[in-house]
Amino acid sequence: QAALDPVASEKPVVVSPNPFYQIYEGATLLGNGEIVYANTTAPRFLPDWHSVPAEKWTRCKIVFVCSPDNPTGSVLTRDDWAQLFELQDKYGFIIASDECYAEIYFDGQKPIGCLQAAAELGRTFDNIIMFTSLSKRSNVPGLRSGFVAGDVELLKNFLLYRTYHGSAMGIPVQHASIAAWNDEQHVIENR
């Protein structure tokens, strides 16, 4: 919502993987955007970005990515990120990378996130925002504690948005969050 222009003459497009986490669609609709789905395809069940018509890409403001994905479990590789970055270079959209499941993997190989992929490919973090939380990492979905990182200008707008639309984190939640972020053993055991 913070990145969409609700008074634009044309509805901004937001591209979402399908299936998807419902908040992507809800935030798009609340921001007066048009949701367009990139269906996942076998065998890897990654979003098929090429199925999105060029006319939609030209109006695209945000692409939601979830890796590891909920609910498919699919994981983007550096090459997959590179392909998405090529589309971003062509159309100028923001990548909103949901990495709440990044700590849940089974083969000992930590998935590469959006910011890491950008850095390894020699890119800046322009028009990239990544978010994660303790919900999945630490099995505390009600705690509502996480963070965002990425493009400084996007983060400034996000901070302004959160200041007026968010809620403050209580001191007990802050202490519990610090303890959870500082403990890796429970994450390893959960994995």
Q: Can you name each region flagged by the protein language model?
A:
Residues V14-V15, T28, V63, N70, ...:
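Generic structural signal for small/hydrophobic residues in well-ordered secondary structure
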Residues N18, Y37-T41:
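Short beta->alpha connector loops at strand-helix junctions that form conserved
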Residues P12, G33, Q88-I94, F125-D126:
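A short helix->loop->beta-strand "cap" motif at the edges of active sites that frequently abuts
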Residues L4-V7, Y24-T28:
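Short hydrophobic alpha-helical segments of the AMP-binding
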Residues Q1-V13:
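Phosphate-binding glycine-rich loop
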Residues Y24, L84, C114-A118:
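Aromatic/hydrophobic pocket-lining residues that form π-stacking "cages" and hydrophobic walls in ligand
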Residues T40-K110:
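Active-site phosphate-binding strand-loop segment of PLP-dependent enzymes
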Residues N127-R191:
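PLP-dependent aminotransferase class I/II
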